[in-house]
From Swiss-Prot:
Molecular functions per Gene Ontology: DNA binding; peptide transmembrane transporter activity
PANTHER family: HTH-TYPE TRANSCRIPTIONAL REGULATOR SGRR, PERIPLASMIC BINDING COMPONENT OF ABC TRANSPORTER
Organism expressing this protein natively: Salmonella choleraesuis (strain SC-B67)
Domain of life: Bacteria
Residue ranges: DNA binding: 26-49
Role this protein plays: Activates the small RNA gene sgrS under glucose-phosphate stress conditions as well as yfdZ. Represses its own transcription under both stress and non-stress conditions. Might act as a sensor of the intracellular accumulation of phosphoglucose by binding these molecules in its C-terminal solute-binding domain.
Entry-linked InterPro entries: SBP_5, SBP_5_dom, SgrR_HTH_N, Tscrpt_reg_SgrR, WH_DNA-bd_sf
Full protein name: HTH-type transcriptional regulator SgrR
GO biological process: negative regulation of DNA-templated transcription; peptide transport; positive regulation of DNA-templated transcription
Keyword Protein biosynthesis: no
Keywords, sorted A to Z: Activator, DNA-binding, Repressor, Transcription, Transcription regulation
Amino acid sequence: MPSGRLQQQFIRLWQCCDGKTQDTTLNELADLLNCSRRHMRTLLNTMQARGWLTWEAEVGRGKRSRLTFLYTGLALQQQRAEDLLEQDRIDQLVQLVGDKSAVRQMLISHLGRSFRQGRHILRVLYYRPMHNLLPGTALRRSETHIARQIFSSLTRVNEENGELEADIAHHWQQISPLLWRFYLRPGIHFHHGRELEMEDVIASLTRINTLPLYSHITKIDSPTAWTLDIHLSQPDRWLPWLLGQVPAMILSREWETLANFASHPIGTGPYAVRRNTPNQLKILAFDDYFGYRALIDEVNVWVLPDISEEPACGLMLEGPIQGGEKAIESRLEKGCYYLLFDARTPRGAHPQVREWVSHVLSPTNLLYHADEPLQQLWFPAYGLLPRWHHARPGPGEKPAGLETLTLTFYREHIEHRVIARIMSALLAEHQVHLHIQEIDYDQWHAGEIESDIWLNSANFTLPLDFSLFAHLCEVPLLQNCIPRDWQDDAAQWRAGEMNLANWCQQLLANKAIVPLIHHWLIIQGQRSMRGLRMNTLGWFDFKSAWFAPPDP
């Protein structure tokens, strides 16, 4: 019998007998465990051989045998829990222990660095699973980061300085205002073993032509081996950066025929997905990666939803603290939480409603009514970026007849719930009921349901001149809520003729967007880890991090 199953049977037997020595029979014990008399004898003999109990069998009618426990069920449960942790079986651990608080403490004690069979393993605790990792779909902040570890693209944007770097393409050039040429590396392999071919690249870039930022791509062809030409309908100075974004990551052309591709995608990046369940995401270093092989062999993201109830539910990779080893990496996000007024509803489009609501739900009001732990993580926002002060809040008069408003945000985001509760209380003081809708991220991203206002958070990556417009333009919700000529805006941006500060100020001037809070991103980690540089998404590049060996 497998060790895990035997441990479960012992724990169950110990619980049924209250851990007490007793005189009993095989039949009575078999009834307790719902098994046959013969199987019960086998179980007792095996448990006795393990040193967990003694079984003094008596033969004869009416005679009772003595069962003595040498091991407690709690001790064995702890041992079983340790085994499950080492095997990364978090789902079974939750079932075994039951108490989420106890599971959390066990997980935290095993976070950080582990060295097993010559392999460096990093364990990370996170507050939600990541079911969808498919480029070109609606991806949240963490999914965006993980996709960058799994996939490669023609170019790569350096997370620390925003500079453009080679990836699948080793060089590129602008042949004419409407034609760019990229030169690709040969010999690149997908995680499932097949070699990358030009058809994979063409198919990947063709499939995203429906996205607003890629809609100006008119034709993609390969004039010679490992040479890719991209034809445009309008000039785009940002195209090389655009082709380094997650939607433009390269997929194998047969991806739609591969089972569960969204949760178990196959790319050419430094890490390959080994497991992705509601309790765990495990990625392994890809030995055949065409770049520098990752120094951390395995990254395990353990999922425990209950940690999201804490305000500082950022990335946690803090193991046992030894000699003041603990370190906290933090940065003020390049972005903010903001309110988005929906011009498709009468209340959302009404200028007086926008003015009054933005006054009542001002950043200072939200901060004042937040709990102290959150006040330490929040900073009032008066622009989309921390250094901008574009918002001009006014006093505003409450519009006559305003009795209710609808607010919508996406699920699995504790701070959204906290902000919504504060907003509800503030509006209730003025006899306005806030109807709150929590929906899936896909629904939120599409923005096709009715809502007066929407709650969102934006994290802009480097370079900001690129990502600020690119991020806002690629979310259908914003284009649905804000009536303006987005195509004309995109043409100006591509031509390098857009003043982004002025453009953002226009969005804030009519209260289409109302900044609320800048948030401190936090990584709780260990000083033994080197190369950890928090990016603007609140994560770090796994392949560049490494562990310093212990002192001799």
